[in-house]
């Protein structure tokens, strides 16, 4: 297999000021493209340090990717370092400079004087378009080896790298499918599928679980075994299809918005313990405005009463964290917004506020269209985990409801 190395550049990485998300992303992607990543290194904004690392790694790998250090300031030294190691000149690309200036004009009234540095191109390099930011990337071929310079911000790097994947794919490239589940525990899923997953040695199986994406079943094999894996996925879906919410990069909120559009339904949400988290997840999806009317964050009991019409008697008798309260929240929300489907959440996120009857992590979620579907949960974890799980489970329940399940 071909070998690859990654150099992430930036003193802020060495000082722990930002997470090195680029290294994680690139390692995963390069593995799928058929490379063995032999080294990931981080160096500061220092010309000698960058140059030495480039010189060393170029002797060992077929593909070298450098991230960061492509901005316009004096400490953006990646171009200079690579040019120095390769003994090539840096030339100002006037056409590229004009494009960079036009891009900057869309967002800023003044163009920095030092912006010319971003238009310096290493002799023989191919310029890589940056669809998000102003710093272009560069690609060079050196004695059969590929050197790629990419900007540091992940939101810029990811689409630029994705545009290169077809060119970088090797004969050892992998084929991978990730199946995503939320309301089924990892151990239960694995037990349900053990006869399919572990009666073969062609597909590598890995399960991962967290409170944001739920359980992810990652299936990986070589590209030549694609048909085998596709058949395996069909068998898995025959057993677990009703629990599946997404495949590969699909997010729960994207699936829910798509289902709402397909069924021509509008949505409104009323949140207490999640504090707008559910609304935020929904509006993160492009096109959500077609189906999402809005949300109410009714954190206090007064707001629950005055905005959503929850009765004083209900709050005194059952409390804000109760089946009765969330049902009245959705009923009031429906009157307020006229949405087809209303969802409400109320719970105890902690660390205080729990009782023996309703410990920290107790959460009620209600879905109301023509009748109520109310569920009680006892989530574990810290405050943020409980809030996140509440919002995600509300989406999962809504997904199941929209898919036509009688029970969520």
UniProtKB/Swiss-Prot annotation:
Species of provenance: Thermotoga sp. (strain RQ2)
- Return the SUPFAM superfamilies for the record: CinA-like (SSF142433), Molybdenum cofactor biosynthesis proteins (SSF53218)
Protein's name according to its UniProt entry: CinA-like protein
What the record says about family reads: Belongs to the CinA family.
Q: Which Pfam families match?
A: CinA, CinA_KH, MoCF_biosynth
CDD domains in alphabetical order: cinA
Q: Which InterPro entries match?
A: CinA, CinA-like_C, CinA_C, CinA_KH, Competence-induced_CinA, MoaB/Mog-like_dom_sf, MoaB/Mog_dom
């Amino acid at each position: 297999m071909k070998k690859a190395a990654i150099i992430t550049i930036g003193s802020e990485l060495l000082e722990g000021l930002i997470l090195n998300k680029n290294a994680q992303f690139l390692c995963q992607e390069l593995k799928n493209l058929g490379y063995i990543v032999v080294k990931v290194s981080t160096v500061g904004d220092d010309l000698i340090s960058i140059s030495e690392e480039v010189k060393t790694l170029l002797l060992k790998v077929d593909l070298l990717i450098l991230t960061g250090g492509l901005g316009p300031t004096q400490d953006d030294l990646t171009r200079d370092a690579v040019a120095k190691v390769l003994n090539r000149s840096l030339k100002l690309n006037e056409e590229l400079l004009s494009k960079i200036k036009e891009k900057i004009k869309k967002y800023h009234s003044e163009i920095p004087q030092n912006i010319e540095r971003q238009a310096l191109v290493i002799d023989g390099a191919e310029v890589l378009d940056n669809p998000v930011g102003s710093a272009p990337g560069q690609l060079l071929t050196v004695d059969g080896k590929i050197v790629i310079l990419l900007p540091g911000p992940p939101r810029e790097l990811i689409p630029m790298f994705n545009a290169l994947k077809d060119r970088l794919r090797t004969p050892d490239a992998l084929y991978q499918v990730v199946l995503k589940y939320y309301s089924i525990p990892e151990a239960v899923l694995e037990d349900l599928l053990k006869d399919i997953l572990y009666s073969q040695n062609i597909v590598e199986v890995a399960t991962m679980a967290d409170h944001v994406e739920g359980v992810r079943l990652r299936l990986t094999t070589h590209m030549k075994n694609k048909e085998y894996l596709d058949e395996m996925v069909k068998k898995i879906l025959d057993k677990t299809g009703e629990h599946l919410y997404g495949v590969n990069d699909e997010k729960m909120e994207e699936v829910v918005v798509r289902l709402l559009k397909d069924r021509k339904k509008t949505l409104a949400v009323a949140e207490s313990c999640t504090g707008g988290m559910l609304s935020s997840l929904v509006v993160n999806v492009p096109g959500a405005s077609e189906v999402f009317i809005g949300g109410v964050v009714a954190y206090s009991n007064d707001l629950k009463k005055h905005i959503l019409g929850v009765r004083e008697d209900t709050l005194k008798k059952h409390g804000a964290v109760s089946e009765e309260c969330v049902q009245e929240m959705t009923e009031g929300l429906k009157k307020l917004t006229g949405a087809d489907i209303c969802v409400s959440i109320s719970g105890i996120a902690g660390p205080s506020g729990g009782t023996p009857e309703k410990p920290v992590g107790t959460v009620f979620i209600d879905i109301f269209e023509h009748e109520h579907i109310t569920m009680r949960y006892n989530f574990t974890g810290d405050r943020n985990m409980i809030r996140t799980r509440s919002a995600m489970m509300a989406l999962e329940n809504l997904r199941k409801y929209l898919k036509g399940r009688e029970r969520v």
